Curated annotation (Swiss-Prot):
Family named by the database record: Belongs to the G-protein coupled receptor 1 family.
Subcellular location, record wording: Cell membrane
Membrane topology: Multi-pass membrane protein
Residues on Cytoplasmic side: 108-117, 178-197, 273-495, 554-578
Name listed for the protein in its UniProt record: Octopamine receptor 2
Described function: Receptor for octopamine. Octopamine (OA) is a neurotransmitter, neurohormone, and neuromodulator in invertebrates. This receptor induces a long lasting opening of voltage- independent chloride channels, a process which seems to involve protein phosphorylation but does not require either cAPK or PKC. The rank order of potency for agonists is p-synephrine > p-octopamine > xylometazoline > B-HT920 > norepinephrine = clonidine > epinephrine > p-tyramine > phenylephrine = oxymetazoline = mehoxamine = dopamine > serotonin > histamine.
GO cellular component: plasma membrane; synapse
PANTHER family the record matches: ADRENERGIC RECEPTOR-RELATED G-PROTEIN COUPLED RECEPTOR, DOPAMINE D2-LIKE RECEPTOR
Transmembrane region(s): 85-107, 118-139, 157-177, 198-220, 252-272, 496-517, 532-553
Annotated disulfide bonds: 154-239
Glycan-modified residues: 13, 38, 46, 59, 231
Length: 578
């Protein structure tokens, strides 16, 4: 037995020497005893008070009393005890501060209150409540190794734990669902998104979580008395996690398995869509510029469909024209300006149609391979703008289409400036052109439906006549756009993998342990191992503010402003982002 002298001050005039004794009985760390001081008035008589040590469990009353000698039955080293206490306290504080800053940013800056960010705010609420109400009690419970807060608190603590953890996991699922819709169905998402729908998702999360967490009071009332039970080996009461196999199966399916499967499916689908977008850009390198001219313009020849990386007739390549054009374009028909159309995305040219009046007429589709919806058998060229150069590409872009009547064809001119224009032979119908540069990752559509014929595309060969002042840069622009899409795909992929990896690492061990304890009564698990797995699940709530906000530039700016770090970028108001 080893003693550590500690000076304690009983009052202003007198100090006492004390010994902090590490007892070999139950390997317990006990509080110091002070010679000359009588503590028997503070504790019941059935507690043994010796001159040197309080034995953790000696003559212990089986009725819970707050004033019993508090000691740890879990650690036999003061160094390990303090280290664990510091780590658990830091996790709790970080979870509180991180999620508090997320909510403060949403409260202070109204421009952040988009549908996606409202779902992130709901996630922060569940994580914050978990950190405030559950984690402090869990810290004390895991440090001492037994329960000191009474039977009612035990039952309430277990239910609150399940409630907030379930709400947090389903909050992650709603965020994934929101991004899934925005990426895979951008047109529908742009039309249907609203704060009301976000509130509906939030209400569903909490109702479902309440049904899961408070089910013991409805269908499993017989197991409630087993939560708070006496452990004879340590002479202490314990608050035991659910062990009923039927309830464990019910809660694990609703709280972990189903949302995990949904999240995995949605993130894989998002990855596939982003990968297809990247492939779409990679394919746009096969058009060649011939030395011949048509009406004084260089001619862009299209490659054969069979010679493109074995893709057959599904997709063909594009050439990208000048990047020095303006940020918008006015569409003119019959010499009259029509400012209702803003062209900021690639336009794809599809199959030849039967010749009419000696010319080959063709249908034009605007399909920038950005929404996972791509048009087969298409050849395309792109007109990037300065606006597109400045903005970050994103996943929420819209597939739009221009259908034209072959019989009513006129000349249409997309006019960039006095010296930069592209003549297209197209015909009438409707034009839907997307804004591919919305920085908030939301889809913004500019729609124009006109009854005027838009012209027709003429030319005896598979070619495009243009007059862009010699600004055609096929190779360099294609490589630049290809690189941008590759980088965007890499960033999005890494972020999705990080989110799923953190979720699986944090919660899957708990899921296996949770199920194993219920089906195997004879399986003995080390108490330190069980506590580490439980806290690993709690850590996910401390990582969520990092994963879902610090990758968002607007949230980073808001955080800097909240803490007073006035960087130059922090002076602008955060804008909505998806």
């Amino acid at each position: 037995m080893m003693s550590f002298p500690i000076a304690l001050f009983a009052d202003v005039n007198q100090s006492f020497r004390a010994n902090l004794v590490v007892s070999s009985y139950h390997h317990a760390i006990t509080f110091p005893t002070v010679r000359g001081a009588n503590f028997s008035t503070f504790f019941p008589r059935n507690f043994s008070v010796s001159a040197d040590v309080w034995l953790c469990g000696a003559n212990f009353s089986q009725e819970w009393q707050l004033m019993q000698p508090v000691c740890s039955t879990k650690y036999d080293s003061i160094t390990i005890f303090i280290t664990v206490a510091v780590v658990l306290t830091l996790i709790t504080l970080w979870t509180i501060l991180g999620n508090f800053f997320v909510l403060m940013a949403l409260y202070r800056y109204g421009t952040l209150r988009t549908m996606s960010n409202c779902l992130i705010g709901n996630l922060a609420i569940s994580d914050l409540l978990l950190a405030v109400t559950v984690l402090p009690i869990s810290t004390v419970h895991d440090l001492l190794g037994y329960w000191v807060f009474g039977e009612f608190t035990c039952t309430l603590w277990l239910c609150m734990d399940v409630l907030y953890c379930t709400a947090s996991i389903w909050g992650l699922c709603t965020v994934a669902f929101d991004r899934y819709l925005a990426t895979v169905y951008p047109v529908w998402y742009h039309d249907q998104r609203s704060v009301r729908k976000a509130v509906g998702c939030i209400v569903f999360v909490w109702i479902f979580s309440i049904v899961i967490s408070f089910a013991p009071f409805i269908g499993w009332q017989h197991m409630i008395p087993s939560f708070f039970s006496f452990n004879a080996s340590i002479q202490r009461y314990q608050c035991i996690l659910f062990t009923s196999s039927s309830y464990v199966l019910y809660s694990s399916m609703g709280s972990f398995v189903i949302p995990a499967i949904l999240m995995a499916f949605m993130y894989v689908r998002i990855f596939v869509v982003l990968h297809n977008q990247s492939r779409g850009v990679k394919f746009k390198s096969g058009l060649k510029i011939s030395s011949s001219k048509y009406n004084g313009c260089p001619v862009i020849n299209e490659p054969s469909r069979e010679g493109i990386n074995g893709l057959g007739r599904d997709v063909t390549n594009t050439t990208l024209l000048s990047d020095a054009v303006g940020s918008s374009a006015d569409l003119t028909s019959n010499g009259k300006d029509d400012p209702r159309v803003l062209a900021t995305a690639p336009i794809e040219l599809t199959e030849d149609v039967p010749p009419l009046n000696g010319h080959h007429h063709r249908t034009v589709h605007e399909t920038p391979y950005v929404s996972g919806l791509h048009t087969k058998r298409s050849n395309s060229f792109a007109l990037p703008t300065e606006l597109e150069k400045k903005c970050k590409p994103l996943t929420n872009n819209i597939l739009h289409m221009m259908d034209f009547d072959r019989r009513n064809s006129h000349n249409a001119v997309i006019q960039r400036s006095a010296s930069e224009m592209v003549n297209l032979d197209v015909s009438k119908h409707e034009l839907l052109i997307s804004n591919v540069c919305h920085r908030s990752k939301s889809a913004t559509a500019l729609t124009s439906e006109t009854g005027d014929p838009l012209g027709s595309l003429a030319g005896p060969r598979r070619s495009l006549q243009c007059n862009v002042g010699g600004l055609v840069r096929n190779k360099h622009m294609t490589l630049s756009m290809k690189r941008r899409f590759e980088l965007r795909e890499q960033r999005a992929t890494k972020r999705m993998l990080l989110i799923m990896a953190c979720f699986c690492v944090c919660w899957m061990p708990f899921l296996f342990m949770y199920i194993l304890r219920s089906v195997c009564d004879t399986c003995h698990m080390n108490q330190h191992f069980v506590a580490a797995i439980i806290w690993l699940g709690y850590v996910n709530s401390s990582l969520n503010p990092v994963l879902y906000t610090l990758f968002n530039d607007d949230f980073k700016v808001a955080f800097k402003r909240l803490i007073g770090a006035r960087s130059p970028s922090a002076y602008r108001s955060p804008g909505p982002r998806r």
